[in-house]
Amino acid sequence: MTEVPWSVVPNGTDAAFLAGLGSLWGNSTVASTAAVSSSFQCALTKTGFQFYYLPAVYILVFIIGFLGNSVAIWMFVFHMKPWSGISVYMFNLALADFLYVLTLPALIFYYFNKTDWIFGDAMCKLQRFIFHVNLYGSILFLTCISAHRYSGVVYPLKSLGRLKKKNAIYVSVLVWLIVVVAISPILFYSGTGTRKNKTVTCYDTTSNDYLRSYFIYSMCTTVAMFCIPLVLILGCYGLIVKALIYNDLDNSPLRRKSIYLVIIVLTVFAVSYIPFHVMKTMNLRARLDFQTPEMCDFNDRVYATYQVTRGLASLNSCVDPILYFLAGDTFRRRLSRATRKASRRSEANLQSKSEEMTLNILSEFKQNGDTSL
């Protein structure tokens, strides 16, 4: 997050309010705090490690995420028909990841260019919008996958009607609508800004002018689209594990797929989503309320850690394809079949070309032999 220096007071209104309270109460501490807050700004981290760390992570995510999700989409479209309910959710998850990795080349260039954004304000807004759509779309689709697997394991007979592909399509459309509507304020809050050295930054949160309202929006989004889904997922997995323990499902495909699902999804949350949301909230709070000289070192560490978690948050686009491979026997089986078929086709083409080349050589040899006679 390369932004203008932090300030506790986006537009000066809060500082004037605090100073007025200090004068009214005769409290010099409040008044002096307001004066310091209105004039003092902690500098951002001086290490510049994000110029190297973030592009390196994004390059890795782009390569692995592009290949993995391209294969996943190809499999779902051409080799996974007819779809099951869980296939619908996985396809939408792969689509969200694929759309996100397509935006990474511009972001990689941005950091190699010392965070000087050259692609315009609209592209900056679109970049941040797609990141958040992928982030929360992935969380909600993982929640749908977890709830689907919970119904199939805990209530295998009662859930037969609810787990149909048609219902999964309706739920997926609803998820996309919820995410797009909930994330649309990002198009207002994000954008570009010009620094004192005339370079252009692309805010990954917002400028100081809208920081306080953005913090409220961010907290609402975090609770509604991260905390609640996390609680639902943990509840589903607790009941799945309980059902696997008490039911005789030793070595069954359902047991194996369920265990893989629990491990992968919880790993994604532990590595990507939880650290990002914790540090994003701490960073916003530091920009708002911890702007004093003695807090600058703390703010600097918070900011640096937040940059690390931003890279981690993008790793889900690499991990999700592993979910399709390990948690879906059908996907793994059909991928193996499609790979063998493509390999045989390639071998047949090579053999055909080799035979054609041999015949051409023999033909030329005979012609040359005839003319020499």
UniProtKB/Swiss-Prot annotation:
Chief location of this protein within or outside the cell: membrane
Record GO terms (molecular function): A1 adenosine receptor binding; ADP binding; ATP binding; G protein-coupled ADP receptor activity; G protein-coupled ATP receptor activity; protein heterodimerization activity; scaffold protein binding; signaling receptor regulator activity
Record topology, Cytoplasmic segments: 75-87, 148-166, 238-260, 326-373
GO biological process: adenylate cyclase-inhibiting G protein-coupled receptor signaling pathway; blood vessel diameter maintenance; cellular response to purine-containing compound; eating behavior; establishment of localization in cell; G protein-coupled adenosine receptor signaling pathway; glial cell migration; monoatomic ion transport
Extracellular side: 1-51, 110-125, 189-214, 285-303
Keywords annotated in UniProt: ATP-binding, Cell membrane, Disulfide bond, G-protein coupled receptor, Glycoprotein, Membrane, Nucleotide-binding, Receptor, Transducer, Transmembrane, Transmembrane helix
InterPro entries recorded: GPCR_Rhodpsn (IPR000276), GPCR_Rhodpsn_7TM (IPR017452), P2Y1_rcpt (IPR000142)
Entry's transmembrane regions: 52-74, 88-109, 126-147, 167-188, 215-237, 261-284, 304-325
Disulfide bonds: C42-C296, C124-C202
Disruption phenotype: Platelets from mutant mice are defective in ADP-mediated platelet aggregation, leading to prolonged bleeding time. Otherwise, mice have no visible phenotype and do not display spontaneous bleeding.
Mode of membrane association: Multi-pass membrane protein
Amino acids binding ADP: K46, Y203, D204, T205, N283, L284, R285, A286, R287, Y303, A304, T305, Y306, R310
Gene Ontology cellular component annotations, sorted alphabetically: apical plasma membrane; basolateral plasma membrane; cell body; cilium; dendrite; glutamatergic synapse; plasma membrane; postsynaptic density
Cell compartments where the protein resides: Cell membrane
Record-stated family: Belongs to the G-protein coupled receptor 1 family.
Function: Receptor for extracellular adenine nucleotides such as ADP. In platelets, binding to ADP leads to mobilization of intracellular calcium ions via activation of phospholipase C, a change in platelet shape, and ultimately platelet aggregation.
The protein's name in its UniProt record: P2Y purinoceptor 1
